[in-house]
Amino acid sequence: GEKYDEFVDKFVRAARKHYPNAYIHFEDFGLNNARRILDKYTPEISCFNDDVQGTGCVTLAAIMAAFQVSGVKWEDARFVMFGSGTAGTGIADQIKDAISQRSGKSTEEAGQQIW
């Protein structure tokens, strides 16, 4: 709620004031807050949310290794996500960006390869 957002904002402002070059690692903010808070502060500070981005990075690395071994092309791959939690949506975002970057498709087109 509002008090939660005020607390996070107060912390981020204090961290920026005292440690202007700090990298902030957000952890366990939950589905309703993780993406929203990450999106709010990413343009302003160096930050990372393990729930959204960490699991996605590890999963993407595994997919990239599998594609290298198997020869599967990004534009030919299809992905099914089971669950819509913070990690699942983060994984889907990482995969969508990778498809777009590696195949030249728009992110909208890339998203059509993910269910």
Task: Please describe what each predicted stretch is.
Residues 1-75, 81, 86, 90, ...:
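Metallocofactor- and cofactor-centric catalytic cores in central/energy metabolism, strongly enriched
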